[in-house]
Amino acid sequence: EEAVPGSDGKGELLAPRGYEPEGSAGYRRAAERMNRIFLEAGFAFVSLKEAASQIERKDAEEIAGLMIRRRQIVQISGDYYTIPQISDQIRRRIREKYRSGEIITIIQIKDMFDVSRKNAKLILDYMENMGIVKQTGAQSERQMR
């Protein structure tokens, strides 16, 4: 058995390994709403806390946790998340434009995705966490692997 998100007041319940709770209609509506929030944000990432606050449910954080486990939302960096379609697009666009060994700067990412410096930094952090780029020493640039 392992702990999985549930509604026992502590946010967890015991269930056989691999068990996934059935999504209630309320869960599905909340998950669809959260998905829309991240989709509409695009590359201007929304924090998980901010997205959860836009869902009118007391268990919004629990729903977000289940969506993370089900890989319906993806961590970009820290508390910032998006949906797989956006994260896939980030990886694809960067891999198409840059080759191994090339340096990528925050300014280039900012221009490529038409985002703020903060969101460009989150994209670089995400790419580093995915192992696609590595730190070069300068805070504002990474090198393609």
What do the predicted segments below correspond to?
Residues E1-R145:
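C-terminal non-catalytic scaffold/interaction domains in large multidomain proteins
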